Amino acid sequence: MKLPGKIAIMGGGSWATAIAKMCLAQEESINWYMRRDDRIADFKRLGHNPAYLTGVKFDMKRINFSSNINDVVKESDTLIFVTPSPYLKAHLKKLKTRIRDKFIITAIKGIVPDDNLIVSEYFNKEYGVPPENIAVLAGPCHAEEVALERLSYLTIACPDKDKARVFARRLGSSFIKTSVSDDVIGIEYSSVLKNVYAIAAGICSGLKYGDNFQAVLISNAIQEMNRFLNTVHPINRNVDESVYLGDLLVTGYSNFSRNRTFGTMIGKGYSVKSAQIEMEMIAEGYYGTKCIKEINKHHHVNTVSYTHLTL
């Protein structure tokens, strides 16, 4: 099976930049949607993203930039969305071009606020994209380490595993190894939950609770995550795999983790607003806590560690 044509990156942050680097290891060229014309102009002038992963150089001849989302969608077949979940709906407001026939890949590790839908469900319900044309890109893979070409491992999940395998081959490289799964729902929810638990780990760090306490927290977190996933989407899965446990560990412990950093600042006494301003990046877990709390009202999963964050 061959996925058709051109890949488009939909977003301009650090993770979008890292994914663009991965794609260009295999693709001759890509389309790239960024909302701001001034950011595109600076990118073209400098040869790198002016705001994120500035050490990653790109060949401008291989990238077709545009701030017009409809033009990018029309000229692309596979759309990789890498917009922070709180802003996804705003980014899509200007979208008039039909996307139900496109192959959608979400690399967004969050829930669409107000709707309380994981991103794959949102594209299915709002835009009519069939589930077999939606994939999720996830795993223990920080953008900063991709920039440094450190060995990383990603999972591509799609109900149609043949499509997942095709994209996995297009994304793999000497420093990116890939696997495939069909657990779209479980992987999306685990990507949300691990950000929430990383904030908790950061708070513990900021409070100087120590490594022993954090080890217990993360141990409890994977058990809670397993209970939640088995309730929301009960299938036969192994949460010890890297896309679940591995992503939780790297997000909970790594200094590259923006959610852990956000939590550490809260633990040190920052207000939420002041932490957000100083970070200049989105900690998805902050928004995810409220969404998961609402979703769990329908499922009543016992999540003691998580519940303390939402009090």
Where are these regions (language model features)?
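Short, conserved catalytic or adaptor-binding loops enriched in Gly and charged residues
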Residues: 53-61, 127-128, 170-171
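Short, conserved active-site loop motifs that form the nucleotide-linked donor/cofactor pocket
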Residues: 62-64, 176
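Interdomain hinge/lid region at the active-site interface
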Residues: 197-306
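Internal alpha-helical scaffold of NAD(P)-dependent oxidoreductase catalytic cores
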Residues: 87, 98, 125-133, 151-238
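Rossmann-like NAD(P)(H) cofactor-binding subdomain of soluble oxidoreductases
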Residues: 66-74, 78-151, 167-169
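Conserved small/polar residues in nucleotide/adenosyl-binding loops
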Residues: 307-311
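NAD(P)+-binding Rossmann beta1-loop-alpha1 motif at the extreme N-terminus of oxidoreductases
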Residues: 1-56, 64
